[in-house]
Amino acid sequence: MKSAEIREAFLRFFEEKGHTRVASSSLIPANDPTLLFTNAGMNQFKDCFLGLEKRAYTRATTSQKCVRAGGKHNDLENVGYTARHHTFFEMLGNFSFGDYFKRDAIHYAWEFLTGEKWLNLPKEKLWVTVYATDDEAYDIWTKEVGVPAERMVRIGDNKGAPYASDNFWAMGDTGPCGPCTEIFFDHGPEIWGGPPGSPEEDGDRYIEIWNNVFMQFNRTADGVMHPLPAPSVDTGMGLERVSAVLQHVHSNYEIDLFQNLLKASAEAIGCANDDAPSLKVVADHIRSCSFLIADGVLPSNEGRGYVLRRIIRRACRHGNKLGARGTFFHKIVAALVAEMGDAFPELKQQQAHIERVLKTEEEQFAKTLEQGLKILEQDLAELQGSVIPGNVVFKLYDTYGFPVDLTNDIARERELTIDEDGFEREMEAQRERARASSAFGMDYNSLVKVDGETRFLGYQGVSGAGQIVALFRDGQAVERLEEGEEGVVVLDQTPFYAESGGQVGDSGYLEAAGVRFDVRDTTKAGGAHLHHGVVARGNLSVGGAVKAEVDASVRQATALNHSATHLLHAALRQVLGDHVQQKGSLVDSQRLRFDFSHFEAIKAEQLKALEDIVNAEIRRNTEVETEETDIDTAKAKGAMALFGEKYGDQVRVLSMGGDFSVELCGGTHVSRTGDIGLFKITSEGGVAAGVRRIEAVTGAAALAYLNGAEEQLKEAASLVKGSRDNLLDKLGALLERNRSLEKELEQLKAKAASAAGDDLSAAAVEIKGAKVLAARLDGLDGKALLALVDQLKNKLGRAVILLGGELDGKVVLVAGVTQDLTGQLKAGELMKQAAAAVGGKGGGRPDMAQGGGTDAAKLDEALALAQRFVEQGL
């Protein structure tokens, strides 16, 4: 069976068992900043397992895209060199949220793996592990399924602590946890390795293909295991691993999907399609890079973008090792789309965007190599001894993406070595930081957990009555909040919009007889709306009735901006093209901010076109229509869904101007487009590679912005003694006059420097056959001093020159050494000493160097170093 057929068979099998097929979530975990990337099928259901979210189904099945590169789960350095390590993989999974448990989960797994209608694997090839004390699972396997005892293995606590076992899973130090049972496939005696639990278990003979986790306990901070009221099931089976089994190969790189990617990689690079690890690196990395970009990650120097940049550059480096010339990586995207585009339509939709990002990053990496070389040269100029420190090697690798092996090559050419141990210490420190940031980082038992959902009344108005169903103080449920206390109020129904979809939460107040709670913000936890604020008067108790009143002016101003965001999105696709995808937004009462995919700055005429289109829709004053429907019907109608956003079974479709703008949106909006009044773009710029940002204002804020601009024009006209009508002519004449004066000033400086050079040459002293000149010239910039040093070198012949001066409170230094002396004396070494004396740094070539500092009082001491430098060096 091909990989695509296995994926579909798995999902269809569990659909027949009453599971809801759920689309893969984004690689960027929703509402979970503690997790770097989605790395397991259960990530998108985490709140369901924690009891914080309830869905319309209790059984689910998915094929989840996962990335393991950076953080706790980091396979990057092994990729390409082993048979089964990948940065990207698919995890097939079936899940039960308080529905079925061990018996059904085990029988389902066995039926799918061995059933004639399904995978039809030979039963005698399958081994099973269970947690040492999980007699229930052991008995189901042996007495009901019929797995013989000789192929059953009990795994105890093999990681040095109670419940620390390959067969015991935990979400964190506290919270849901439980035993797991794993299914292994035996590749046969011709492959080295032993069964699970044996000393040879790390061999390739017995390969884990399926893991069933039984969440049946809640571990509290004291280590006590409490049975969960509704035990759940979380399973995972790696698609690539089971594909290798069914296709009778021993390496994931030999399965159909990778064979096609390896072929495309070899063609793009122009090398042989052989078993080279570097080729496997490229074929693997195109998957993780493409999917990360499709999900909104872009190369950067921090966080997720930094990991993406590392993966891209690793692929480029390995491509270069295979002989690639120029950019090649982006050319493989088409082959990936052909393989996986049907299962993951976001690849098809964003193919051009992915290719452009990869090509841009490849080109940037080529420039980065040049930059890294310059940085390395500066560090080598300051090097004392013959070993490049580990922190320098790490800085080049980590900050500039400079490959360690290249640093090593350069060091070897100069008879230097690198401090490999020091570099490894820096790398380990980075890994520790990543591991710390990748943990869930929360105590499950201190989370705000609310049963039920809050009914939202805000589409109908800004006020309503509700009953208090829960109160929280410092994350703990309480029965009462006293006057002056800060806390969270949960109502059975509310007109307050909870922050989501880029729109900020509502503010306002809750009121009852003698009681007032000022609401500063509103957020969501599962389906509940959390009103954050302070008790301004009286006290609140669970069960009490309150009147909820949203700040109407803030809500209305926010609605103007949110509706304008939808119009802007549609206008962008009209003006720039369908490649435009929303990458983020912020909507509050003051402004709107919209991030989107595009590869160049928007031209002035395009910005004007955007404003004209949006304002035309505003003037049309069409009704804003909403419709509640299911997600599939909404997409069939052309509604734009934001990839990675979590949508329920029922969605709200918002339409403006007929079919001008049709999007899925749960936010609050105007009734008619004319309510927006006016739309004005205030700024446009880049926020990351391939992502632009537009900020704008609407309504009264737009009028205020235009009035402010008008006042600035009047003030500018007054400053140049003109009017609004002739302001541009006046400014043009002023700038031309300024350029003329600057040119005259440069000419005067050059004459002064030349005259100074004539005078200075006479001040040079001779030391060991070389002329040495050190002089102070305040008021000259580095450019003028460089020209003067060049002039003096020609006048003096065999010479060492150090010039410095104070300019705008800072020290400027320039050093020069004539070519006949650079074998013994280096301008960079002299500059290093002189700049250090004035509290600064410097460097450059052996014949010319620049530097500076902040301590002008030490300038004369710095200049005096020139004579000693020559005396010691000759």
From Swiss-Prot:
First-level EC class: ligase
Q: Tell me its EC number(s), please.
A: 6.1.1.7
Pfam family, any one: tRNA_SAD
Which CDD domains does the record associate with it? AlaRS_core
The record lists the catalysed reaction(s) as: tRNA(Ala) + L-alanine + ATP = L-alanyl-tRNA(Ala) + AMP + diphosphate
The UniProt keywords, alphabetically, are: Aminoacyl-tRNA synthetase, ATP-binding, Cytoplasm, Ligase, Metal-binding, Nucleotide-binding, Protein biosynthesis, RNA-binding, tRNA-binding, Zinc
Q: Which domain of life is it from?
A: Bacteria
- What GO terms describe the biological role, i.e. biological process, of this protein? alanyl-tRNA aminoacylation; negative regulation of DNA-templated transcription
Q: Name one GO molecular function term.
A: aminoacyl-tRNA deacylase activity
Extract the PROSITE patterns matched here. AA_TRNA_LIGASE_II_ALA
Q: Which family does it belong to?
A: Belongs to the class-II aminoacyl-tRNA synthetase family.
Described purpose of this protein according to its UniProt entry: Catalyzes the attachment of alanine to tRNA(Ala) in a two-step reaction: alanine is first activated by ATP to form Ala-AMP and then transferred to the acceptor end of tRNA(Ala). Also edits incorrectly charged Ser-tRNA(Ala) and Gly-tRNA(Ala) via its editing domain.
Designated name of the protein? Alanine--tRNA ligase
- Can you name the source organism? Pseudomonas aeruginosa (strain ATCC 15692 / DSM 22644 / CIP 104116 / JCM 14847 / LMG 12228 / 1C / PRS 101 / PAO1)
